[in-house]
């Protein structure tokens, strides 16, 4: 009889990585969507399902009524805080301002993740409801896999083997949401000329007029990698084109994106918001993240939303406008919704600490190789996923966050350090057990976005289990080891981030302008 004394699983709901000792799945939430039996044309609405109807637009807004502020219990007595809007002085406020819940729907599944503003293109100060504004939202690669748009930027408009997305897997609906105060929600009701209702602070989710596109994926991002499979970091950026003449797109721009831009600039703007440190410098920091996992709503609460309605299945999938619309309201009995959530540590302190060896016989050390909570992903051959049907091996470096366990839907959350700089992106949780029964640790996992070149110099005089083959990389601005990075897209499309690169005097941000760097589209 085979007895496994110690084991762990790294879980989320987006993908699975399986070996004898580990199960990895990402913290995105995915639900199957039944294949529709009855087809409707694009003018059909279900008037019997709604107490009143929105005549203003064919895009939709969800308002999920507030559950009571409380401490939720998830997964073997792990606790976290939900349903809150941080005060201006709260260390979580910057993350709140930048962060959104994302919902991708196809005819085959309904998936949720978390994203945050990384860049934009257009006049953020405009008061004119005309033209387009582009917002760029960072998230996980496995969350971005839920976006399958036949009108996407090349090469993302097809699978890796150039197969076109079929109608069941193509994204037909997208919305972006945020936990919002009741004053702003009341204003939205007035703008929509809807029946006034008493509302609390609630999750507000708004459908965009266009299906998003893919700006960047961290696939095959490293030079000189010795790997059987192509490599990935769990990071991607999606592009939202907002038509400011459209009421709902204007609401997204005015209520979500503009406040996020103000916060982004207050944090130092593009060239000051992202941390790059030697690996051991992460050890002494606390790390702060909040996201939008999909959780069970309070039983005494209703969810007010606009109904997803299906257009005719013969609709032209090449057009960029959305194929589903939420254009009627109803009270839904949905038991789970995205809920703004932050970690609640067992010791009552805020923020997450790096996992470190607590005893010489730590059970964690026996099942996962790490150096004081710093992980080298290429040491784990089962850390892999499929993006658009192609399998990738995870590479790069990450943080193990002690006593951290946010459920599915939180994937893509930005992680801030003590200096209010973003150092990594959250993608899953490692649940460690002893004797296959007793829960021992909840360890959140994140992918570092930038690593210091100084590590390579240190590596010449030191060899450890995790750093004997260290390769620095920079997924945002690029460096000599990184062949695919976001700034390539920013340069090609002349976004705000590239404007900041041009105006910076620091060489570390200028790599995109050296050696005629290719765009990431050629490097998938």
Swiss-Prot record:
It is found in: Cell membrane. It is a lipid-anchor. Keywords: Cell membrane, Lipoprotein, Membrane, Palmitate, Signal. Residues 58-68 have a biased composition (Polar residues). A lipid is attached at residue 27 (S-diacylglycerol cysteine). InterPro entries: Mycoplasma_peptidase_DUF31, Peptidase_S1_PA, Uncharacterised_MG067. The keyword Lipoprotein applies. Belongs to the MG067/MG068/MG395 family. This is Uncharacterized lipoprotein MG395.
């Amino acid at each position: 009889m085979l007895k496994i004394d110690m084991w762990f699983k790294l879980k989320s709901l987006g993908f699975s990585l399986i070996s004898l000792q580990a199960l990895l799945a990402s913290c995105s939430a995915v639900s199957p969507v039944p294949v529709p039996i009855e087809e409707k044309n694009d003018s059909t609405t279900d008037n019997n399902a709604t107490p009143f109807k929105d005549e203003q637009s064919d895009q939709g807004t969800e308002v999920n009524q507030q559950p009571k502020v409380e401490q939720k219990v998830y997964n073997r007595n792990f606790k976290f805080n939900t349903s809150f809007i941080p005060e201006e002085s709260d260390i979580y406020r910057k993350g709140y301002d930048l962060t959104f819940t994302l919902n991708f729907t196809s005819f085959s599944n309904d998936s949720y993740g978390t994203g945050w503003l990384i860049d934009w293109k257009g006049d953020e100060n405009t008061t004119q409801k005309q033209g387009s504004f582009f917002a760029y939202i960072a998230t996980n690669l496995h969350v971005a896999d839920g976006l399958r748009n036949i009108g996407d930027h090349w090469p993302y408009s097809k699978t890796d083997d150039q197969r076109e997305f079929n109608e069941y897997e193509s994204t037909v609906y997208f919305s972006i949401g945020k936990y919002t105060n009741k004053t702003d929600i009341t204003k939205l009701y007035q703008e929509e000329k809807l029946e006034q209702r008493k509302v609390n602070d609630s999750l507000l989710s708004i459908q965009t007029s266009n299906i998003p596109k893919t700006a960047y994926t961290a696939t095959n991002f490293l030079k000189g990698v010795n790997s059987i499979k192509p490599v990935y970091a769990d990071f991607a950026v999606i592009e939202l084109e907002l038509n400011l003449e459209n009421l709902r797109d204007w609401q997204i721009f005015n209520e979500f994106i503009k406040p996020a831009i103000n916060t982004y600039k207050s944090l130092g703007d593009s060239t000051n918001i992202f941390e790059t440190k030697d690996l051991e410098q992460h050890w002494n920091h606390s790390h702060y993240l909040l996201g939008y996992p999909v959780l069970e709503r309070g039983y005494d609460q209703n969810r007010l939303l606009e109904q997803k309605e299906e257009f005719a299945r013969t609709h032209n999938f090449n057009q960029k406008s959305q194929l589903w619309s939420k254009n009627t309201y109803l009270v839904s009995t949905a038991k789970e919704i995205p809920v703004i959530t932050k970690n609640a540590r067992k010791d009552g302190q805020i923020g997450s600490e790096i996992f470190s060896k607590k005893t010489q016989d730590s059970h964690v050390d026996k099942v996962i190789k790490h150096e004081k909570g710093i992980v080298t992903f290429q040491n784990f051959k089962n850390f892999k996923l499929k993006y658009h049907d192609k399998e990738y091996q995870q590479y790069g470096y990450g943080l193990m966050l002690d006593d951290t366990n946010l459920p599915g839907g939180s994937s893509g959350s930005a992680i801030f350090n003590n200096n209010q700089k973003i150092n990594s992106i959250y993608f899953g949780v490692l649940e460690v057990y002893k004797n296959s029964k007793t829960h021992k640790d909840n360890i959140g996992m994140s992918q570092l976005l930038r690593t210091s070149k100084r590590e390579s110099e240190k590596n010449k005089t030191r060899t450890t289990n995790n750093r004997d083959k260290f390769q620095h990389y920079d997924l945002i601005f690029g460096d000599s080891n990184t062949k695919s990075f976001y700034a390539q897209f920013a340069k090609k499309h002349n976004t705000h981030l590239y404007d900041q690169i041009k105006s910076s005097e620091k060489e570390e941000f200028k790599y995109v302008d050296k050696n005629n760097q290719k765009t990431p589209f050629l490097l998938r």
